[in-house]
């Protein structure tokens, strides 16, 4: 049985392994474990935040251990541009977020999960579009052109939107010039360092599967005229007619009419699944994951879907004097929905006396003849806009300790992005807003690619 030294409480999740072999297990909720070992074997007990213990197998009696806190391990280590440093020794302005704070969120990407986590860092959405991007400001708006921070994923320039929050080990935000000095002018807007999860050496293979679901909805809608109120208002002020009873002198409209907010807004569902497999041997560690996200927009006919694959491994040789590793992320996103800056304004202003459907019009949509606005649902339906983006991130490194304290690191990074855009416009008649007598189809694609090669020397001797 494994217990905590000060409280004598059982410790679950402690890794127990036979030294020099791949045999291992993990303690249960009661701190108990079972492992096959021969007399003379050494059992190693290890877990985060506790001092590692080694015990020799001398007989068939149970081996009980009491683990003490490792104060050095518990002192937070912060990643900065030119290495790592204990937080107590840090002079620069750095904000950090741990995996514990990010796990369990139904967030589409790491930028969304970062909202409200670090003081002084602003994270906002440019629109309510589920396919829209997030804007992150680390140092405020200091430039008229570009205030975006530089994103570094596992040591190479990357893209925060392609990282699944469940795959993140930590996020460090470098706010001042000293912490981000190694990146030069590219770090004018700050630096966001993302470290993805790794396996652990001498750890048995572990499988984690998570499933999340959530909802998004509009908690309150605006109060607008119903059909009868709109008709009475229009007739009283002698507004131009729309053919549905709002014109001066026409028969008043009777009833509620169309609630366009109810037609266009919905309770949107979000589904997310993630599976991670990790482990390690005596000389290395590995971690890989797959994830899927399906996110509906609050606005009808808007959806976002994404697939993520991540691979990461690290291996050491010659008593850890040579280390090699790689990190790869493949991200596929699919988005649909025709949204512009006036979409919500159109929903609030479109007359409630106009029905959603009218079979006498081309396309079967209800129209207005006295307002230059489209039927909101018709506009979202006849304009079918879709995007599909594939992003590939690959980073490989080699690190060698030349002499004690002096390390050379070679880093190679590749980023590639391919986007396909498709826009289809169906036949419609939307009154004074306009009509389309024959369908239109437009397609285009673009490809973007970048390479980075870095060589660094780091000397650390205390």
Protein language model regions, located:
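Surface-exposed loop/interface segments of Gram-negative outer-membrane beta-barrel transport/assembly proteins
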Residues: 201-257, 298-304, 308-393, 409-462
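Beta-sheet entry/capping signal
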Residues: 285, 405-412
């Amino acid at each position: 049985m494994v217990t905590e030294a000060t409280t004598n409480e059982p410790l679950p999740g402690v890794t127990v392994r036979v030294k020099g072999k791949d045999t291992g297990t993990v303690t249960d909720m009661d701190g108990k474990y079972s492992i096959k070992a021969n007399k003379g074997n050494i059992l190693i007990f290890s877990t985060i935040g506790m001092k590692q213990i080694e015990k020799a197998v001398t007989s068939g009696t149970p081996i009980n251990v009491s683990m003490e806190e490792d104060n050095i391990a518990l002192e937070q280590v912060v990643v900065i541009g030119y290495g790592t440093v204990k937080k107590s020794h840090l002079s620069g302005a750095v904000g950090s977020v741990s995996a514990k704070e990010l796990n369990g969120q139904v967030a589409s990407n790491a930028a969304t999960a970062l909202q409200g986590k670090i003081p002084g860092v602003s994270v906002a959405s440019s629109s309510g579009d589920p396919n829209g991007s997030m804007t992150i400001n680390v140092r405020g708006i200091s430039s008229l052109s570009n205030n975006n921070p530089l994103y570094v994923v596992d040591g190479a320039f990357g893209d925060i939107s392609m990282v699944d929050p469940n795959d993140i080990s930590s996020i460090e935000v470098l706010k001042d010039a000293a912490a981000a000095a190694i990146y030069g002018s590219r770090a004018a807007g700050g630096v966001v360092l993302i470290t993805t999860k790794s396996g652990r050496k001498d750890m048995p293979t572990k499988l984690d599967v998570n499933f999340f679901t959530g909802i998004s909805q509009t908690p309150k809608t605006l109060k607008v005229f119903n059909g009868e109120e709109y008709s009475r208002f229009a007739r009283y002020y002698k507004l131009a007619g729309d053919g549905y009873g709002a014109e001066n002198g026409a028969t008043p409209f009777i009833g509620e009419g169309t609630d366009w907010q109810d037609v266009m807004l919905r309770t949107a569902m979000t589904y997310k699944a993630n599976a991670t497999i990790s482990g390690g041997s005596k000389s290395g560690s590995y971690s890989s994951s797959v994830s899927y996200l399906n996110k509906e927009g609050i606005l009808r006919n808007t959806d976002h879907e994404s697939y993520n694959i991540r691979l990461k491994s690290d291996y050491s040789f010659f008593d850890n004097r040579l280390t090699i590793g790689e990190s790869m992320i493949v991200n596929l996103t699919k988005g649909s929905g025709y949204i512009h800056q006036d979409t919500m304004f159109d929903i609030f202003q479109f007359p409630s006396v106009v029905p959603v459907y009218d079979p006498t019009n081309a396309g079967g949509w209800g129209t207005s003849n006295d307002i230059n606005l489209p039927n909101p649902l018709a506009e979202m339906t006849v304009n079918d806009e879709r995007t599909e983006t594939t992003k590939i991130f690959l980073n490989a490194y080699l690190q060698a300790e030349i002499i004690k304290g002096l390390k050379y690191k070679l880093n190679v990074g590749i980023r590639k992005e391919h986007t396909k855009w498709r826009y289809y416009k169906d036949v419609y008649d939307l009154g004074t807003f306009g009509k389309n007598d024959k369908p239109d189809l437009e397609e285009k694609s673009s490809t973007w690619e970048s390479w980075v090669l870095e060589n660094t020397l780091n000397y650390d001797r205390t």
